[in-house]
């Protein structure tokens, strides 16, 4: 029997072609919402609902490369979803990882959730590995190292991103792990969130870039909504990035 981790599970659950979900979406003041390319690695519908409240969303297959996403859809930001399987699998998960890294290098705002977080970790040069005990359920405590706040989160994953200082925490006896890679992001990163139970990495912030990731599911339904403001954090990040770009354009025209 083929081990589940050997299959390209992302390819089996991603959408078949890119679709614009809510064309012409506007905010409460009638202004157009920013356009977001959401890479589907097995995305949950409630994540799409949360994104569509804040963005005009292009739902993209994981195999669609970054250059094609940009040329065909001209997004303002990029999102990588949750999904099944080994994040280091050489199939569609790797394609999604390459798109994430390219978006970061292009200074595009990026957010990753669950598998998307693990893909960003791999792109940053960190290893991913199988946990001894996967995080399952709606009562996983996560510490925000910047604010000290503890959120109760919903999680369902068996792999984790290694800590850049402490290495692999609570690994599985099988030793399943990815190879050591290089940082393909063009910037450094810092650990923002950790699991309060086993201290494993739960979120990364990229230094000097409008990008961050989280391992948990902020949109869980049913489940805790402590972390749902993270979608607002990303929305604000995108709006600020677009405003900065507009100001730079105006300054350039005045010279």
Describe each PLM feature range.
Residues 1-73, 87, 219-223, 233-255:
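RNA-binding accessory domains that recognize and position tRNA/RNA substrates
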Residues 35, 56, 109-111, 127, ...:
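Proline-centered loop/turn at the N-terminus of a beta-strand
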Residues 35-40, 153-154, 212-216:
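Active-site-proximal beta-strand elements of phosphoester/diester hydrolases
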Residues 57-59, 128, 191:
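Generic structural signal for residues in well-ordered beta-strands
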Residues 72, 77, 82-164, 224-233:
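Cysteine-nucleophile active-site neighborhood
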Residues 83, 209, 219:
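Flexible loop residues that form catalytic
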Residues 149-208, 254-255:
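Catalytic beta-strand/loop cores that center a nucleophilic Ser/Cys/Thr
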């Amino acid at each position: 029997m083929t081990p589940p981790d050997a299959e390209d599970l992302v390819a089996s659950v991603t959408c078949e072609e890119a679709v614009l979900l809510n064309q012409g979406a506007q905010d409460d003041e009638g202004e157009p919402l920013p356009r977001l390319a959401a890479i589907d690695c097995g995305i949950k519908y409630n994540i799409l609902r949360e994104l569509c409240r804040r963005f005009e969303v292009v739902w993209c297959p994981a195999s669609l490369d970054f250059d094609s996403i940009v040329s065909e859809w001209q997004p303002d930001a990029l999102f990588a979803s949750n999904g099944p399987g080994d994040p280091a699998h050489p199939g569609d998960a790797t394609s999604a990882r390459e798109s994430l890294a390219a978006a970061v290098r292009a200074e595009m705002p990026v957010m990753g959730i669950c598998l998307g977080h693990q893909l960003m970790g791999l792109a940053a040069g960190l290893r991913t590995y199988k946990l001894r005990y996967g995080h399952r359920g709606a009562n996983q405590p996560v510490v925000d190292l910047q604010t000290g706040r503890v959120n109760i989160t919903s999680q369902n994953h068996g792999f984790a991103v290694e800590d850049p200082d402490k290495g692999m925490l609570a690994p599985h006896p099988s030793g399943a792990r990815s190879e050591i890679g290089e940082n393909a992001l063009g910037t450094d990163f810092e650990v923002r969130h950790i699991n309060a139970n086993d201290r494993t990495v739960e979120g990364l912030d990229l230094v000097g870039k409008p990008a961050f990731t989280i391992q948990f599911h902020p949109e869980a339904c049913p489940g805790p909504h402590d972390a749902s403001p993270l979608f607002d954090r990303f929305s604000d990040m995108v709006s600020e990035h677009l405003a900065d770009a507009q100001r730079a354009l105006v300054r350039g025209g005045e010279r």
